[in-house]
Swiss-Prot record:
One GO cellular component, as annotated: cytoplasm
Main localisation: cytoplasm
Cited InterPro entries: aa-tRNA-synth_I_CS (IPR001412), Arg-tRNA-ligase (IPR001278), Arg-tRNA-synth_N (IPR005148), Arg-tRNA-synth_N_sf (IPR036695), ArgRS_core (IPR035684), DALR_anticod-bd (IPR008909), Rossmann-like_a/b/a_fold (IPR014729), tRNAsynth_Ia_anticodon-bd (IPR009080)
Assigned protein family: Belongs to the class-I aminoacyl-tRNA synthetase family.
Motif ('HIGH' region): 129-139
Protein known as: Arginine--tRNA ligase
HAMAP family: Arg_tRNA_synth
Top-level division of the source organism's lineage: Bacteria
An example Gene Ontology biological process: arginyl-tRNA aminoacylation
Enzyme Commission no: 6.1.1.19
Location of this chain's protein in the cell: Cytoplasm
Complex and partners: Monomer.
């Protein structure tokens, strides 16, 4: 409906150009059509007249009046008013909302989706945990946000490629191998001989036992087998990484998260991508030698200081493979690249972008885009939950899913804006009450399914065609409020895609569920009059469809019974 009003306003502006009220060469304004905070101000409002007033050399209210008079007439608009300094408020006719409810039924799963992305490819990287231990709840938040961002982008017509970057090179992998070897030799974390910086969780003992048992790990088309040799560090390292990568993959699968691409940091070295990135930076003239190290003059590109690329001992800093990895994304044809990270990685953003700009290979400024998430605090019984026996020092994603369930875990981890800190209340997530938002939304969906079952049990045949034909009967306030809420869904999908904020979908679904429950409690649905009954069931089915569509974007199930 917003697009309908934009079209009417644009036609009105053209009419003002044609009659000389506006200069013929004036640029069309980037005006806003939005829903006012209160419905007393109409269903939609625009600032178009205020933006055009200067070009027209007119008072904004006077120009608003002229624009209102120039608007084409539409049966979907019942009233147009001028408010404040020159806002134009639109009141929609009930028929507009009734047609929108009918559109939901006809478009079904496609309702709310748009083609703004035009099928262009966007790479979405998320989780990207080191393969050194179980996924913690912070990784879980990254997984939920990243997966939902990709789903929302798909709904906005993008071709989202989901990517996991494994940091399988460096000191942390060596510490993993040393920790596993120590466990193989019977050394516990509190005993002499335990490696400095070793991983202390009980899961390391699991890795060690599997290695010595000759267990096999199937991972992306290849098999890694435990060599049973306690002194073969290369074999231990390879097995430990494969074992823990597989464990992480199992947790992500249980969480409903999958990836198109698993990219290994080690491949950047093996395939010459790190060397290529360094060569491009040197060729561009933005590097210099100092103190035996190779530096990037990243301050030329907005960084707060120059960055070391190659240390005096010949090894590269983490910055270099990060730049090489993002260069590979560009070379793979990603028109957009979005990286979901913990907020503690904020310091790396400017340097990676500076490195990409310094290559001078056509990568645009602001590429890649970043979504940063804050920490998660897990509460149970009013107290913070910190430890996991399996991980040793943190509460794992697997622990959380086992306690709260997949749906509640996904919902709660994306329910707030990514850059805000999140408190996950396990007790609330397990409640089957209206206080639990995921239960409240899912129950609205299940309630419609129950209505249809009740109708069938009573021998009342639901005729959808008859219901669509009689939606015009539903002009009471509660029905129109529900239709109004339903009609917001396409706008929410678009807004979530632009802002990369899937929590907007969760917030909307709570509001839609509230509108539905309010309508349900105040509206007898299974009435004797067939036309009324079919119309009400059709409206209920429209609400159910939008609830299902929105829950799908969040990766949360839409149950038929609860």
């Amino acid at each position: 409906m917003k697009n309908l009003l934009r079209a009417l306003i644009s036609q009105g502006i053209e009419a003002l150009r044609a009659n000389g009220t506006l200069p013929a060469d004036s640029l069309p304004p980037d005006f806003v059509v939005e829903r006012p905070k209160t419905r007393d101000h109409g269903d939609f409002a625009t600032n178009a007249a205020m933006l055009l007033a200067k070009a027209a050399r007119s008072n904004p209210r006077a120009l608003a009046q002229a624009l209102v008079e120039a608007l084409p007439r539409s049966e979907d608009v019942s009233k147009v008013e001028i408010a404040g300094p020159g806002f134009i408020n639109f009141h929609l006719a009930p028929a507009a909302y009734q047609r929108e409810a009918a559109s939901v039924i006809k478009e079904a799963h496609d309702y709310g989706r748009n083609l703004s992305g035009n099928g262009r490819t966007v790479g979405v990287e998320y989780v990207s945990a080191n393969p050194t231990g179980p996924l913690h709840v912070g990784h879980g938040r990254a997984a939920a946000i990243g997966d939902c961002v990709a789903r929302v982008l798909d709904a906005n017509g993008w071709n989202a490629k989901r990517e996991f970057y494994y940091n399988d090179a460096g000191v942390q992998i060596e510490n993993l191998a040393l920790s596993t070897q120590a466990r193989i030799k019977g050394i516990a974390p509190d005993q002499d001989g335990w490696p400095e910086g070793g991983y202390r969780g009980e899961y390391i003992a699991d890795v060690a036992r599997a290695y010595m048992a000759g267990a096999s790990v199937d991972l992306e088309g290849s098999t890694v087998v435990g060599a049973k040799d306690p002194d073969d560090m290369q074999a231990i390292r390879r097995f430990a990484v494969a074992y823990l990568r597989n464990e992480q993959n199992l947790d992500l699968a249980a969480f409903g998260v999958d990836f198109d691409i698993y990219f290994l940091e080690s491949s950047l070295y093996a395939d010459g991508k790190v060397a290529e990135a360094v060569a491009k930076l040197q060729a561009s003239g933005h590097t210099y030698e100092e103190g035996g190290a190779l530096w990037l003059r990243s301050t030329d590109f907005g960084d707060d200081k120059d960055r070391v690329m190659r240390k005096s001992d010949g090894t590269f800093t983490y910055f270099v493979p990060d730049v090489a990895y993002h260069l590979s994304k560009w070379q793979r044809g990603y028109e957009r690249a979005i990286t979901e990270l913990g907020a503690d990685h904020h310091g790396s953003l400017a340097r990676v972008r500076a490195g990409l700009q310094a290559m001078e290979v056509g990568i645009p400024q602001g590429w890649p885009e970043y979504v940063l998430h804050q920490m998660v605090t897990v509460m149970r019984g009013g107290e913070e939950v910190k430890l996991s026996k399996r991980a040793g020092s943190y509460f794992t994603l697997r622990d959380l899913i086992e306690e709260a369930g997949r749906d509640a875990t996904r919902w709660f981890l994306i329910a707030r804006k990514p850059d805000s800190q999140l408190t996950f209340d396990i007790d609330l997530a397990r409640q089957q009450s209206n206080d639990n938002p995921v239960f409240y939304v899912q129950y609205a969906h299940a309630r419609v399914c129950s209505l249809l079952r009740q109708a069938q049990e009573k021998g009342l045949v639901y005729e959808q065609g008859n219901g669509l034909a009689n939606l015009g009967r539903l002009a009471d306030d509660a029905s129109l409020l529900l239709m109004n809420e339903i009609s917001r869904y396409p706008e929410v999908v678009e807004a979530a895609g632009v802002a990369l904020e899937p929590h907007l979908v969760a917030q909307y679904l709570r509001e839609l569920a509230h509108a539905f429950h309010t309508w349900y409690h105040g509206t007898p649905v299974l009435v004797e009059d067939a036309a009324d009954r079919n119309a009400k069931l059709t409206l209920a089915c429209a609400a159910r469809q939008v609830l299902a569509n929105g829950l799908e974007l969040l990766g949360v199930s839409a149950p038929e019974k609860m």
